[in-house]
């Protein structure tokens, strides 16, 4: 696995999201009760940013374009209109550095 430093942990306040990019891949980092999760940033239904204008409630993000919802832990659709899950990305914290493996995005089983 190839992890890339994307931000400082303090850059993502609890209940918020931050968009990060590497090699043309955009990932949203979500802070859920102090735990960080990484998913693709674009909604699978309307190609809309989930980190910019999306609404995070617990571990569910709502797309601001058509109100579809996804679980940020699993990437799974929680409410239509989307029918395709989000890719999730391996993430780890070292000290306060947030690292993401942009090459290992996957769909949860």
UniProtKB/Swiss-Prot annotation:
GO process annotations (BP): catabolic process
Record keywords, A-Z: 2Fe-2S, Aromatic hydrocarbons catabolism, Electron transport, Iron, Iron-sulfur, Metal-binding, Transport
Residues the entry annotates as binding [2Fe-2S] cluster: 43, 45, 63, 66
Superkingdom: Bacteria
SUPFAM superfamilies the record matches: ISP domain (SSF50022)
UniProt entry tagged with the keyword Electron transport: yes
Rieske domain segment(s): 4-100
PROSITE patterns, per the entry: RIESKE
GO molecular function, one term: 2 iron, 2 sulfur cluster binding
Record Pfam families: Rieske
PANTHER family from the UniProt entry: 3-PHENYLPROPIONATE_CINNAMIC ACID DIOXYGENASE FERREDOXIN SUBUNIT, FERREDOXIN-RELATED
Family that this chain belongs to: Belongs to the bacterial ring-hydroxylating dioxygenase ferredoxin component family.
Function per UniProt: This protein seems to be a 2Fe-2S ferredoxin.
Quaternary context: This dioxygenase system consists of four proteins: the two subunits of the hydroxylase component (BphA and BphE), a ferredoxin (BphF) and a ferredoxin reductase (BphG).
Protein name, per record: Biphenyl dioxygenase system ferredoxin subunit
